[in-house]
C-alpha cells in the first residue's frame, strides 16, 4: 500500500502491529517515584523503516504521551520531524503517530517522553509493598509477560520484534537498582543516583526487567565465572542459599545439555512480595514469588524445597528456550512453557535422584489430561487474535500437556538423539524467533523419523485418545477414540506411539498406531497367556499422552499385577488414573474403581499413594451428593485403607528417612483429617496447642503443619472459633510466605459454611496479598463449595475490578468447577451470561462444562444398582 493511501483507521482492531517499521535498539531512561507511586521516562528507539510510510504504530497502554514529546529523526537528516497527530487507542493498546511527511526507508530515531503510574495490579511497572525496620515501603518491579512492557514504555511489544536495550535508571541513592545486565556506572547526585546498565543482547520486550528497592543478597559463581545472586528482603538472605546452589548447578547442567553457554555475564534471582505468577524468566534477572525462591531450613517443608528446585530450573531453562530462542508469536507459547516444564524435571532428577521426580511428573500429565478431556479445551498451538486472549493460554495445556508430549517424543526418539537435535535447533535460532514447525524440522533431521506427521496430531488438534484394548484369540484388538470426561464420543484421531509389555518389563513392543482400529499379533502373547500370572500393560511407564481402557479380563489381570507388585510405580499410577477418568466419564462402574483402590494396600511409592488419596477424596465429594446414605461407609472403607500407612509413618520423622517420606506424611495425615478420622484430628489438636505456646517445638515440624491446620479446622464451627482465631494469629505474626500460604490453604477446609464465608471475606481483606488468594480458594472443602459460589456472585464486581489475568481466572475455575448439580450449572451459565469478557471467556466455558460432567457422574453413580451393597461390603471387608 502506498504511503499516501494509509490512514490511521486501518491500524485499529488488528491482532498484530504492522510490519513496515521495526525497532533495532531502545535507549530507555526511567525515573520511578516510589513514594508518589508514579514514574516518568523517555525512550530513543532506533527504528528501521522498511517501506515508505507517514505512520509509526507501536504499543502503549496506560501511559501519558504528549504530542510535543514525540519526534523522529531520519538517519543523516538535518532536521527532526514532528508528528501532525499522536493518537492513543486504549482498546488496542497502540499509539498511532502520524507525520505530514513520508518517512524515508532506512534507519531513524524515534524519541518519546512519557509518564505513568506505578500500579498495584502486579503487571507492567508496578509497586510491591514490603516492611523495612517496621516501616511499610514500596519497591518498583516490572512484570511484562505476556504484553505489559507497553505499560512501562512505548515499544513494539511482540516477541518477534527483538532489539537491543540500553537502560538507565534514576533512583533514590540508598536503593538497589537491578536490570537484565550488570551496572556499568553509578553517578550519585545528592539523594538521587543515575544507574547505567550494560547493553543487552538482542531480546524481546517481554523479557526486559527493572527493580528498585532495599535488598540483601547471597552470591556464588559458576565454574566458568558467571556471577549468580539471590536477592531477598533485608534480613532474609540466608533463605536464598538453597535456590543459589540449585541455580549454579542448573546453569552448568544446561550449558552442557543445550551445548551453548549461558549468554549473559550474570544471573540475578529475586523474591518479590507481591507477584502474580510463580516466577518470571526475565533475561538475567528472574523474579519469583517468595514461596518459589526462599527456603528456611527450620520452617519450610520438603514440598517447599522441591517447589524451589523445580521452579528455579524451569526459569533458568527459559534463558535458552524462550530468551535466546523465542517463540515467533503467542500461538507457540507452549514451546516456551512445555519445554521449560519438562526440562526442569530433567534438572531436578539430575540433582536429586532420590526424589523420583519423573514419577511425580505424572501429576503434571494428570492435570493436562483433566483439562484436555473437556470439549472446551484448546489445541497446544492455539490461535491468538487479541492481547486479552493471551493470559488464558498460560494453562495446563501449554505447560503440562506441552511437557507431556515433549516427554512422549523424547521417549520415542531416544534421549541422545533428542538432545543433539535440540542443541542444533538452539544454535540455529539463537537470538531470533522460531515456530513449532522449526523444532519439528530439527528433530526430524536429527532422528530421520517423521516427527512432523507424528506431532501434528498432538499439537494442532485438541484432546487425546483413549485406546480400548481387548484380548481375542491370541490377538490384541485395539481401537482409539477421543477421550472426553463427559462420556461423549469425540472425533479426533492421533498417531499414537504405543508401547506395551507382557508379564515382564524385559521385553517391550513399540509401534505407531495411526488408524482407528488395529489387531496386533504379539508373538509371545499366546505363550504368555498360558501363565497364571499373565498381564499386559500398554503405555509402559506412562510416557505417552493417552489413556488405556482394558476389557474386564485384562483389567482384573492388572489388578492382580498391582497386588503382586509386578508393575513399576509409574504404571501403578497410570492404571489408577485411567480407571478413575473412565469411571468419571461413565465408561466404568464406581464399584470397579473401589475394588481397584483396595489393590493398593501395600503401596510404597509416594506419588502413587498421593494419587490414590486424591482419587479417594474426589469419590467422597461425589458420593456425598449421589448417595449421602452411603457416605459413612465409604469414609470408613477409606480410613481403614489409609490408617495402616499412617501408623507406619507416624507424625514424627525417623532417622534415615528421605524427602518422599516427608511428602507422604503430610499428604496422608491431611487426607485422614479431611475424612474426619478422630485419632488424627485429636493428635493434631494436641500438637497444635503445644505449638501455639512454643513455636520452636519439634512436635509440629513444617511437613505436618498443613495437616495439623486442616485437622484443627475440622473442629471449628461458628460457636467454637478458637482454632480459627489461633491460626489467624500465627498468620499475622509470621513473616515466612510459605507459612502464610499453609495457613491460607487450611482455613476454608472447615465444614461449617458460616466459617467458610468468614475465611473468604478475610481473603479480600488487606491482610492477604492478592496473589495469595488462590491458596485459600483451592483449600475450600466439600462443605464450602456452594457457599463459595454464592459468595463469588455477591462479590463479583469487586473481584473483577481488583484481580486481573490468571488470578481472575482462578476465582472462576476454583469456585465454579467443583459444583455438582445441573441446577448449579444453569445458575453459573445465567450469572456469567452478561459478565463474560474475553479474558475469562474460555475459563467460564470450561468451568461450567466441569459442573455438567460432575452432575453426570453423580447421576450415573445413583444408577449403579448394587452400590449400597458394595459400600456395605467393602466397609466391613477391609
From Swiss-Prot:
Keyword Protease in record: yes
Point out the annotated site residues (description: Transition state stabilizer).
Answer: 399
The places in or outside the cell where this protein is found are:
Membrane; Microsome membrane; Cytoplasm
GO cellular component assignments? cytoplasm; endoplasmic reticulum; extracellular space; membrane
The protein's Enzyme Commission number: 3.4.11.2
Q: Which residues form the active site?
A: 315
What keywords would UniProt list here?
A: Aminopeptidase, Cytoplasm, Endoplasmic reticulum, Hydrolase, Membrane, Metal-binding, Metalloprotease, Microsome, Protease, Zinc
Q: Which InterPro entries does the record cross-reference, listed alphabetically?
A: Aminopeptidase_N-like_N (IPR045357), Aminopeptidase_N-like_N_sf (IPR042097), ERAP1-like_C_dom (IPR024571), M1_APN-typ (IPR034016), Peptidase_M1 (IPR001930), Peptidase_M1_aminopeptidases (IPR050344), Peptidase_M1_dom (IPR014782), Peptidase_M4/M1_CTD_sf (IPR027268)
Region called Required for membrane association, residue ranges: 105-212
Q: What class of enzyme is it?
A: hydrolase
List the membrane topology term(s).
Peripheral membrane protein
- What's an example Gene Ontology biological process for this entry? peptide catabolic process
* Bound cofactor: record note: Binds 1 zinc ion per subunit.
Q: Which residues bind substrate?
A: 145, 278-282
Q: Where is this motif: Dileucine internalization motif?
A: 727-728
Q: Where Zn(2+) is bound, by residue?
A: 314, 318, 337
What GO molecular function annotations does the UniProt record carry, in alphabetical order?
alanyl aminopeptidase activity; metalloaminopeptidase activity; peptide binding; zinc ion binding
The cofactor required is: Zn(2+)
Known partners and oligomeric status: Homodimer.
Domain topic, free-text comment: Dileucine motif seems to be involved in protein-protein interactions.
The similarity annotation says: Belongs to the peptidase M1 family.
Cross-referenced PANTHER family: PROTEASE M1 ZINC METALLOPROTEASE (PTHR11533), PUROMYCIN-SENSITIVE AMINOPEPTIDASE-RELATED (PTHR11533:SF174)
Q: What is this protein called?
A: Aminopeptidase M1-A
Please report the organism this UniProt entry assigns to the protein: Oryza sativa subsp. japonica
